[in-house]
A protein has these predicted regions:
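Non-catalytic tandem-repeat scaffold regions and their flanking low-complexity/translocation tails
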Residues: 1-277
Length: 277
């Protein structure tokens, strides 16, 4: 707990104009990943007042990262740096920094983090560019769903649904099951809010297919519940009931598992949405 608090304190001091005090706090942070994060944080804080002045500090952060021997720790520090560079609009630098990660999945995670910052800033076109560099459905779909939501809110439901359908298209790369629930939630929520009803069947079907890649049966149940709730909210009650039945069968095949009760609770929420309870 202490290190994140020190990092936040250093950044707040620099943002308030006390650069000297902030750097004193940075030097209290141990060398390695925490020091790299502290330097990244104060760089971004300084960059919010003077973007050019942040560059030397970002370079110090990169030098600190280069000295981290453990690869996964180094990748996490790079991911943090990418987000901070993105926050202050140094997008070219952030993109290039992400590609210092030499493994595909951690690099995609860094780009997803970059995309989330851009989405929070309302820079949707810039965020959408990143989908071409993130080959994993569960990650890229989160960005594409946010952009689709933006399109729908700008009265382009057709464009929104087209992007949501594309978000669930196979990419030829392995599907990372741990990212699928968030992706399904983002895509289905966006489709319900702003998508064309005529696109529902295709998108819901793709979402149902995607649930099959999940590694445990109870995770599949929760994914099917997400689909069923979306179907029910669209008034596709018969489809929702079929999806609920499929989820119910899978759940009871695993009634001895630890997550069985939570799976039943999830199914009951879908039944409520479909008017069955």
């Amino acid at each position: 707990v202490r290190m994140p608090a020190l990092i936040q304190l250093a950044a707040k001091m620099v943002e308030a104009g006390n650069q000297r005090g902030g750097m004193i706090v940075v030097r209290m942070v141990p060398e390695g990943a925490y020091r790299a994060e502290a330097l990244s944080a104060v760089s971004a804080a300084l960059g919010r007042r003077n973007i050019d002045a942040a560059v030397p500090l970002f370079r110090l952060a990169e030098e600190e990262i280069d000295r981290i021997e453990d690869q996964s720790t180094r990748f996490r520090a790079i991911t943090y740096l990418v987000a901070r560079e993105t926050e202050i609009g140094r997008l070219k630098d952030a993109f290039e920094t992400a590609f210092k990660i030499t493994e595909d999945v951690p690099r995609a995670e860094a780009l997803l983090g970059m995309g989330r910052v851009l989405i929070d800033q309302g820079k949707l076109p810039e965020a959408l560019v990143l989908k071409d560099y993130i080959p994993y459905i569960g990650m890229r779909a989160q960005i594409m769903a946010a952009v689709a939501l933006g399109r729908g809110l700008e009265n382009d439901p057709e464009g929104a649904s087209a992007l949501l359908a594309e978000a669930l298209d196979p990419t030829g790369f392995p599907t990372l099951p741990e990212y699928v629930p968030d992706a399904l939630d983002a895509v289905l929520s966006a489709q319900i809010k702003v998508g064309l009803e005529s696109a529902d069947q295709a998108i819901f079907s793709r979402a149902r297919d995607l649930s099959e890649v999940l590694t445990t049966d109870l995770a599949k149940v929760r994914a099917l519940v997400q689909v069923a709730i979306a179907e029910a909210r669209r008034g596709r009650i018969e489809d929702a009931q079929k999806t609920i039945s499929a989820a119910y069968r899978i759940a009871f095949e695993n009634k001895g598992d630890q997550g069985f009760n939570s799976a039943l609770l999830a199914i009951s929420l879908a039944q409520l949405a479909a008017g069955d309870l």
